[in-house]
Swiss-Prot record:
Pfam families referenced in this protein's UniProt entry, alphabetically: Phosphodiest (PF01663), PigN (PF04987)
Protein name (database record): GPI ethanolamine phosphate transferase 1
The family this protein is said to belong to: Belongs to the PIGG/PIGN/PIGO family. PIGN subfamily.
Gene label: mcd4
Keywords linked to the UniProt accession: Cell wall biogenesis/degradation, Endoplasmic reticulum, Glycoprotein, GPI-anchor biosynthesis, Membrane, Transferase, Transmembrane, Transmembrane helix
Organism whose genome encodes this protein: Aspergillus fumigatus (strain ATCC MYA-4609 / CBS 101355 / FGSC A1100 / Af293) (Neosartorya fumigata)
Length: 1032
């Protein structure tokens, strides 16, 4: 095929990584939902009643297990009580009384993503949706699978439209009633307890209406009915004020009081003691007011069950009690009562049993027998029915898998023959129950249930080896293809031709045809065909351009001839891999607080200029010192806590640094740029004044952002909500600061320092508005370090070029033709040099700084580590997509800054456009492939969430780098470096004569080649490498 150019390569990189990023969801997180199963319930004697006639489910959205049971100072003492009294009390006395005297309790462990939709689906359907379902709860997406609500005779529900609507629309028409409040009252900055009191009041209204409505009264008195109270107040309060705040703790008191009132109301209405109550939460809440990832604070929720059919508390006399060994509940004061932990999906099975319903057909929850008060026979029958439901799901999934594959290998423990057959297992358990033996059937049902889950797991992962092999070859093929393309475009300058043979064409075509035939027979989705096509395309291209790899090796490593040369090259390779592995080590640490590897790297990096000798440091003392200071300051941010508390003083310090930096540049711009003139435009007094006016407006926006942010924070902290005027001004500053830079086109100043200052001031207001702590300080230090890096890399480039010219006679580089090439940028033709091994260091530095831009203010686990408090200054009501967009905007700002700096560095080092970006994309997938094999879909919830984030961040990094390349083109279009750098090139020429210039052009070429190239080109000295007016 035709050789891809720069933009073709970048486009291919984006498409490939976007498609392959989705591969983990086709491999690790395939939806477990199947259809066509029959339902199972407990088979009772005719006339026998279910454990309860009705079920009441309370879900306290966002309630952490520890906060529900821990004692704490009263956050809202009653009138007449001492407000200064800090004696701890139990915030949920009614719930606690159920634990102590009436029911069974434990901790319900959720899975990632710890969001409302997946949590409620697990609770009510017994199903763990695949991870990609996280955002489906942000809009109406009916649950297209069975649930406890769907199995009920009728369900009444009250609460948030985000949860209730999806269960109502997904159930049998008319089976679920949903009474929902409007989304506009979900205001994170106001008193969220009103969301819960609204629900409690609506429940009271329903039962009050039944007294005068015989039809409603009759419906309420039927059996197998469910009442669902979704209590969103705690989640909203936790986001706005965090779970250790007085507001959150007060909300717990409100919920407890409301639950008591509703429980009493229902008991009095029916008067038959035939109601079962379940109190739990869909997910927890982290200390920084977020959820979504697998942190234990997000995955551990309370579970308290009481009422009809529920076992009472199990006390022991001075003996250790099972369930408290982990120490998590040590300060709850419940050590004398047995704690029964469950998986969240188990709650669905428990509710179905208590209400006398069939188990939801997609449920993987195991009935927790410790929670039920029943005879041994009833428990044995319930355990059997629960197991039959899961086995039915296994039977249907296996039949589907068997029909789709060319050759199917059955799951041996449940193979359809002899003693292992499902029917044989069920028959044996039924015989034992009929003979009056119950303990053994319960054990066997539990073992068979676990085997059935293993069988489902076997079917779920059946295609893993096949798919992971394809994906692995795809990533390895991309790495090889990318390196080949970089060598072809930027080392050989397209002088090597592709060469295919008949044999190779037949070989690769045959593999593709065989692969597609298998996929077609198995009726695979279209993504599988794309997954398979990429590795074949990449490896075929690498084979066809194998001569480019050989020629590139001779140019890049041809100078390594002696033993000492091999030792030096090996040492450089070890150092390169060590830094890359250090980044990998950072990701492999399964914790939120171990970012110190970046601190170590920055400290070591501060000594980097010394590697070029004392003479270099002496010539660039200020630059080297600034770099050391920048690295030292950057190293401190990864030592600061990830969990940040809103601190207006820290926000102010960062904003003032931004403001005074812009003001200083505005006042002394002529002095700073006095040695520079734009080669493309010589601004006069009017244009200079216009440029200063626009920049002055940018500086003013920084100050206005600080003022409105301080005002908004004060109002929000005082619980007065967000004033409308503040919201308007905040949005005005955000939008205006991003629009103002475009007016600089009217009065252009093309110096690269001026361009970087414009970018710095462009994003400063956004960073101020969306920061809650030290992020503004980080932004200032990060920008300072990047500018220093660009100048330092250029200084090293000039210094090493001058040194190689001085010692040209001893140059060990083999004599190769000087492959100087040209490119048209901004309508002008520029010459550029080919890449060398030293440029991989630049790519590695960029790679490291790119990651530090994210991890210096947060953790890798998920965006949930970034507080929502800053977003409330612009959007105080629940709007997940808009709020997430603002958080992502804040995360992307440092990346935009670094892209501009690398684009400038690309030109200062006189390499072709995109050359350095392409090198970065070539090496980044070493990390991506590492994380691909680290992805887990089982184990601890923290592990699952963290590994998903690892892979996606690494995978999108390459895509993001491609996007940054295009962004940098916009930012540095027409940029000029002034005559100072031209003077540097001239000084090299003056020092070493005519050879210096071409050495700078092509540091890999020997002096004779440089001279020949110069003569052939008809150019002199540094003019051989004209770029933006001849600058180096």
């Amino acid at each position: 095929m035709a050789r891809l150019g720069r933009f073709g390569f970048l486009a291919l990189a984006v498409v490939f990584h976007l498609i392959y990023a989705y591969s983990i969801f086709d491999i690790y997180f395939v939806s477990p939902i199947v259809s066509g199963m029959r339902s199972y319930g407990v088979e009772r004697e005719p006339g026998a009643k279910a454990p309860a006639s009705r079920l009441v489910l309370f879900v306290a959205d966002g309630l952490r297990a520890d906060k529900a049971f821990q004692p704490a100072p009263d956050p809202s003492p009653e009138d007449g009580e001492d407000a200064e009294n800090n004696d701890p009390i139990y915030l949920a006395p009614f719930i606690r009384s159920r634990v102590l005297s009436h029911g069974t309790f434990g901790v319900s462990h959720t899975r990632v993503p710890t969001e409302s939709r997946p949590g409620h689906v697990a609770l009510i359907a017994g199903l763990y949706e695949d991870v990609s379902a996280v955002t489906t709860g942000w809009k109406l997406n009916p649950v297209n699978f069975d649930s406890v609500f769907n199995q009920s005779r009728h369900t009444w529900s009250w609460g948030s439209p985000d949860i209730l609507a999806m269960f109502k629309e997904g159930a049998v028409p008319g089976r679920v009633d949903a009474d929902m409040y409007g989304e506009e009252i979900e205001d994170f900055t106001m008193d969220a307890t009103q969301l819960d009191t609204w629900v409690f009041n609506k429940v009271k209204e329903l039962f009050a209406s039944a007294k005068s409505d015989p039809e409603l009264d009759a419906k309420l008195r039927q059996d197998k009915v469910v009442f669902f109270l979704h209590l969103l107040g705690l989640d909203t309060t936790g986001h706005g004020y965090r779970p250790y705040s007085r507001e959150y703790l007060h909300n717990i008191k409100i919920v407890d009081k409301g639950v008591q009132e509703i429980a009493t109301l229902i008991e009095e209405f029916y008067g038959d003691d035939r109601t079962a109550f379940v109190f739990t939460a869909d997910h927890g809440m982290s200390d920084w007011g977020s959820h979504g990832d697998g942190h234990p604070d997000n995955t551990r929720t309370p579970l308290v069950v009481w009422g009809s059919g529920v076992a009472g508390p199990k006390y022991t006399d001075g003996k250790a009690v099972t369930g408290h060994e982990d120490g998590f509940s040590a300060d709850w004061g419940l050590d004398g009562i047995q704690r029964h932990d469950v998986a969240q999906a188990d709650v669905a099975a428990l509710m179905a049993y208590l209400a006398g319903l069939d188990f939801p057909v997609n449920s993987v929850g195991q009935l927790p027998l410790e929670y039920i008060d029943a005879s041994p026979k009833e428990k044995a029958l319930a355990a059997l029915a629960n197991t039959q439901e899961v086995l039915e799901m296994y039977r249907v999934k296996e039949a589907q898998k068997r029909a789709a594959l060319l050759r199917y290998k059955p799951f041996e423990p449940l193979a359809d023959h002899g003693k292992n057959s499902v029917e044989e297992h069920i028959a044996e358990i039924q015989v034992l129950i009929a003979n009056g033996s119950y303990d053994e059937p319960i054990k066997r049902s539990g073992a068979l249930f676990a085997t059935a889950l293993e069988g489902l797991r076997y079917l779920q992962t059946y295609d893993w080896l096949f798919l992971r092999t394809i994906i692995t070859f795809g990533y390895l093929g991309w790495i090889a293809y990318a390196l080949t393309t970089v060598i072809d475009l930027h080392v050989l300058h397209r002088t090597s031709d592709s060469k295919r043979t008949v044999g190779s064409t037949i070989f690769f075509t045959s593999i593709l045809a065989a692969l597609f035939s298998v996929l077609l027979y198995q009726k695979s989705s279209w993504q599988y065909y794309v997954y398979g096509a990429f590795p074949i395309f990449f490896w075929e291209e690498v084979f066809a351009r194998r001569k480019a790899l050989i020629a590139g090796r001779e140019i890049l490593l041809g100078h390594v001839r002696s033993f000492g040369g091999y030792i030096a090259s090996g040492f450089q390779l070890v150092a390169f891999v060590a830094v890359l592995e250090a980044l990998l080590m950072r990701h492999q640490v399964q914790s939120y607080f171990h970012r110190e590897i970046y601190t170590v790297c920055f400290v070591l990096g501060s000594f980097w200029p010394i590697l070029y000798g004392v003479d270099f440091v002496r010539q660039n003392t200020v630059l080297s010192a600034t770099w050391a200071v920048g690295c030292s300051l950057m190293s401190t941010f990864t030592l600061l806590p990830v969990i940040k508390v809103e601190n207006i003083n820290t926000i102010t310090y960062g904003a003032l640094l931004m403001f005074f930096t812009g003001l200083f540049y505005l006042l002394f711009e002529d002095t700073i740029l006095k040695h520079s003139k734009s080669s493309g435009h010589a601004p006069g007094a009017i244009s200079s004044l216009g440029s200063r006016v626009i920049m002055g407006m940018q500086v003013g926006m920084v100050l206005l952002a600080l003022i409105v942010t301080r005002s908004s924070v004060s109002s929000l902290q005082a619980k007065q909500g967000l004033p409308f005027g503040n919201q308007v001004v905040g949005w005005f500053v955000l939008v205006a600061s991003l629009v103002l830079p475009f007016f600089h086109r009217l009065y252009p100043n093309s110096h690269y320092l001026h361009r970087l200052m414009v970018l710095f001031l462009t994003f400063s207001p956004t960073f101020i508005i969306l920061t809650i702590s030290y992020e503004g300080l980080f932004y200032f230090v990060f920008c300072m370090t990047l500018v220093t890096w660009v100048r330092l890399e250029h200084a090293i480039y000039v210094y090493t070029a001058r040194s190689s010219a001085h010692y040209g006679g001893n140059n060990t580089v083999p004599k190769k033709p000087g492959l100087n090439a040209t490119a048209v940028i901004d309508g002008q033709e520029y010459r550029y040099r080919r890449l060398g091994l030293a440029d991989t260091r630049v790519a590695l530095f960029f790679f490291f700084l790119l990651q530090s831009a994210f991890f210096s203010t947060g953790n890798i686990a998920s965006v949930s580590s970034f507080s929502l408090e800053s977003v409330f200054r612009l959007i105080p009501v629940f709007s997940p997509f808009s709020q997430s967009a603002l958080l992502i905007l804040k995360l992307l700002i440092p990346f935009a800054i670094i892209s501009a700096n690398l684009g400038i560095l690309n030109r200062r080092l006189e390499v072709a456009p995109s050359a350095l970006f392409m090198v970065v994309m070539s090496i980044s997938d070493v990390m991506t492939l590492n994380f691909f094999y680290m992805v887990r879909d089982e184990g601890s919830w923290l592990d699952i969430g963290t590994t998903i984030s690892h892979f996606l961040i690494a995978s999108f990094l390459c895509t993001f780098v491609a996007g940054l390349e295009f962004l940098s083109e916009v930012f540095i279009s027409g940029v000029d470096f002034g005559p100072t750098t031209k003077a540097i090139g001239a000084s090299i020429t003056k020092t070493v004569g005519g050879t210096a210039g071409s050495d700078v052009v092509d540091s890999q070429s020997g002096p004779e080649d440089a001279a020949n190239s110069k003569k052939a080109e008809g150019l002199e000295g540094s003019e051989t490498i004209r770029q933006n007016g001849g600058s180096v």
